[in-house]
């Protein structure tokens, strides 16, 4: 939805093209509440296929996000700490853990 995010994504993927001895091994796209779910439905919709258990770090994540006081909103906004924690809980239940971060694999080179 955000044009600057799309441009940054395209620049990152372009700059990360596989080349001998300098290949970026993994490119993961992450979910941004109040942006990802409003993307152009004619384009690829965020469909996570890579999850990381963040149960040990959820409170640290929330504490770190508080620094971004211009981005974090009050509940029930999608970018409230409550909503962020709730989404992490839902993503965690998808993989059988308390909290998880969900990603879409753009590319993995092994």
Positions of PLM-derived features:
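Metal-dependent de-N-acetylase/amidase catalytic core
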Residues: 1-110
């Amino acid at each position: 939805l955000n044009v600057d995010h799309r441009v940054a994504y395209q620049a990152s993927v372009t700059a990360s093209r596989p080349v001998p001895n300098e290949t970026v091994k993994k490119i993961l796209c992450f979910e941004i509440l109040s942006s990802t779910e409003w993307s152009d439905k004619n384009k690829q919709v965020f469909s996570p296929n890579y999850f990381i258990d963040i149960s040990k770090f959820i409170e640290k994540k929330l504490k770190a996000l508080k620094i971004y006081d211009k981005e974090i909103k009050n509940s029930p906004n999608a970018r409230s700490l409550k909503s962020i924690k709730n989404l992490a809980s839902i993503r965690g239940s998808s993989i059988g853990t308390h909290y998880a971060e969900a990603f879409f694999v753009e590319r993995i080179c092994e």
